[in-house]
């Protein structure tokens, strides 16, 4: 059994109305078996298990983020060590949340629209025609709400790759014309991952507000390196939890 099969056990199931006798010799796992296995995995790989459940939306991410925060605080990074304690305590939690958001992304996930800040609308200054009681029309400039064209008023956008639309492969037009039959290749935009990663420029913009004299060297060797280590830690812990679950349920 793998971790991807766990979320369905957290969803309520409708009763099976049938006159068929249930099988008594089935080798399948019951819900009780799965829950017991989860308890054992949680005791052996608490961080990885919490990270996965938080990623799929089953569990609140607070515990997983706290575990990542403890890991980040223990990192011996020269750039972060030079910061004042106040600035360090402001930057590290942000980097942790950014890394968790990057780890949680998939082709099916949604993200807040950055163009409208999740509101679905833009406040724009437009010329509006006003009519007085006497019938005269006057043109005035007013702030009006307009639908965001990027998210179409939803306030969120899909994180799926725009090149392959979450498929991981795209049509190879050159070879298709050559062979006369559809030929596909790995999407060069997402490298087959099916989704786009969070651009680290967002994190850099936030860090630069707290560290105005931030240089490229400090960013890549310090803050960006911490983000990469945190994301790698997430995947390592999830893989360890997966190994423990398979060992328990084999």
Regions found by a protein language model. Give the residues of each.
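N-terminal alpha-helical interaction blocks
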Residues: 1-130
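Short metal-coordination and nucleic-acid-contact micro-motifs, chiefly zinc-binding Cys/His arrays
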Residues: 109-112, 144-147, 157, 183-186
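Cys/His-coordinated zinc-binding microdomains
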Residues: 117-120, 152-155, 165-168, 191-194
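Short, non-ligating residues that shape and space the ligands of small metal-coordination modules
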Residues: 122-125, 157-158, 170-171, 196-199
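Eukaryote-skewed repeat-based solenoidal scaffolds used as protein-protein interaction platforms
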Residues: 130-138, 142-150
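Short linker/helix segments within small regulatory modules
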Residues: 135-141, 174-182
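Short helix-loop boundary/capping segments
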Residues: 162-165, 174-176
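Alpha-helical oligomerization segments
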Residues: 186-187, 195-250
